[in-house]
Amino acid sequence: MRTLPLNGSRNSSRLPTLLLAAGLAMTPWAPALAAGMEGMDHGSHSMPMGASSDAPAQSRTPIPPVTDADRAAVYTSHSGHQVHDSAINSYFVADKLEWQDANDGSALAWDLSGWIGGDIDRLLLRSEGERTNGKTEEAEVQALWGHAVSSSWDVVAGARQDFKPGAPQTWAAFGLQGQAISDLDVEATAFIGDAGQTAARLEADYDLLLTNDLILQPTGELNFYGKNDPQRGNGSGLSTSEFGLRLRYEITPQFAPYVGVTWNRSYGKTADYAREDDEDVAQARLVVGLRLWF
């Protein structure tokens, strides 16, 4: 038989391809290779249509520059005072302006205070007293310098002038005032008077919010003296105490009528002086009054 050469036939160009396909089909790993090709995700190889579409769009509204007014607003306190404010401010309150039903007649009592100055240093003014049946029984005025030592406490120093009882008397005063806890106001003041007389006073009051407008206020005051003073009816040690409970209704924050009751008591030699003058050692009083501030 005569054999034709491979390059001499018309189909000679297809023979290498057929032989390669037959050889691959006969290999043992051909099925695994085919399965692997079928499991490939050919769609993941597609190129994104527009890469620039994924970038965030830039705002067409320009951001305005920060102004001095913007910077100042950052440091503005909600209470109306600037940080380290040097402006002069003031506050005055008639904490007690009341009529009292005393055992020996009706009485008018007051407890006023206020300040004027800056956030750190202030002039403090205080006054309290009582008139019974048209006669002044007690009256005093204090003028103090106050210096803030923290956000809640001030040290105070100045002078106190007594007009009644007895002859007028002048005291040097120094102490602390502030808030021990929220809404608990405390004043602790020591006094040095004429002829080596000394005294101390501790006052506290607390505002208990019953509703937005109804407030119950317990109060307390203790007075101490270093030595006996028969002319003014003050004995050494714990001299007098006064505790009160007042319920006020705030028609506005600046105007609040109230009703309440107080308990007054004298101790030791002070009580002895009261008995000698036919005065009560202890008594309870019904009170009606107004609380004002501006």
Swiss-Prot record:
Function of the molecule: Exact function not known. Could be involved in copper resistance.
The entry's keywords: Cell outer membrane, Copper, Membrane, Signal
Signal peptide from the UniProt entry: 1-34
Protein name: Copper resistance protein B homolog
Subcellular location field: Cell outer membrane
Bilayer-spanning residue ranges: none
GO annotation, cellular component aspect: cell outer membrane
InterPro entries: Cu-R_B_prcur
Region (Disordered): 40-60
One BP annotation, GO: intracellular copper ion homeostasis
Principal location class: membrane
Family matches, as SUPFAM superfamilies: Porins
Membrane topology term: Peripheral membrane protein
